[in-house]
Amino acid sequence: MSVKWAIKTIIRDLQYLCNLSLYALTQQKASAKPQVRYSKEGALAPNHAKPICLFCSYDNESIVRQNVYYYLKQLALAGFDVVFISSSDTISDADLQKLAGYCIRIISRENKGYDFYGWKTGLEQYPQYHAHPGLLLANDSVLGPLFDFSDIITRLENCNADIVGMTDNFRFYPHLQSYFLYCKKPVILSEEFIGFFDQVKVVGFKIAIVRKYEAGFSRLLGKRFRLAALYSLERVLDQIPYRERPKEWIDPTFRLWKPLITEFKFPFLKKSILTRREVSMQEVAAVLAENGSTFDVGMLVDWVAEIALESRVGSR
């Protein structure tokens, strides 16, 4: 690690501590337990021979987007039972009816605590999760699957690890990124797993979520269980010429999205690529088409239009 990067890390840590202290001083009732507005069975009956997926979703306009339905459909086709956990303000009757066709349970909860509290709510509302052979924690922060996903359960189960993610990150502490975390049976039955989610609290400071819960999950569970990423940062960097490699630890889904797709047929694209890096939909569509993706970017039209509107409003 270079001296420059070490200094940057120290500065970020100090900023984090200052922001966390400020958040703690200003926080009042934000830590109250989020209200569960709705929790009912879907049209599909649970199948305890299948792994369960707890899928967290949020939309500013309280719409379940086409790309979310596509992801849910692919999860179901791959062999997952799905519990849908929404933190949007509401779920329309039309969406409830459509979601029921993909899910064994649909939950609507107050928007507090980000995804880790959403997954905690899912575990509380569907305590039968431990009867399934495995558990996937997933969310709609990604677009996809971009390529064939039918064998994903086999790939996860065949991986020589107890907890399997798509990608890893080295910020704060080496950890698996939480947008896709698969836990095998011994993990979900363990005291460590149960204890971790028991102590999850409402935290409204996003970087604290990453540090305390995303990195903290790997740090705690890694003391007993083996962790692995299907598309590890080391593996991705090996495919990039040395001079073109980032000179610091980075988020591979954000900085290396293109080589992930072109070299590995990576099944997901982080939404933040389009919202924060300002990569155009046309560029993404071209990369996907050139690499034989089956993902229809046409289903993103309404979502991309919303991003453009928010950008115009924010620039005024």
Q: What are the residue ranges of the model-derived segments?
A:
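ER/Golgi luminal nucleotide-sugar-dependent glycosyltransferases, focusing on the catalytic module
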Residues: 1-316
